[in-house]
């Protein structure tokens, strides 16, 4: 049961554009982690610009007001290679959906299965 949290600045992403980003994240999870299509859990947050704070650039990446901050949480137990493949797949798909390769930052974490309920 992966959970994706998508954070954007209010007004920067219309319904169509956010749907593309959402679909890109889910497609990467299905492709890399082999989650079934019905295993779909996402929270989309829109923040006023004054509450969405970030550096203008970091490690060669240059951000605009279209920056997306992604937070992926999934059950532990997958290999390092699989986790790295997921990050690469999410990055590639979200960059294509959002329009700029620099405008997203991704954080992932793993949790014990016992900590999930559903």
PLM feature segments, named:
Residues 1-118:
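A domain-level signal for the structural core that forms small-molecule/cofactor-binding pockets
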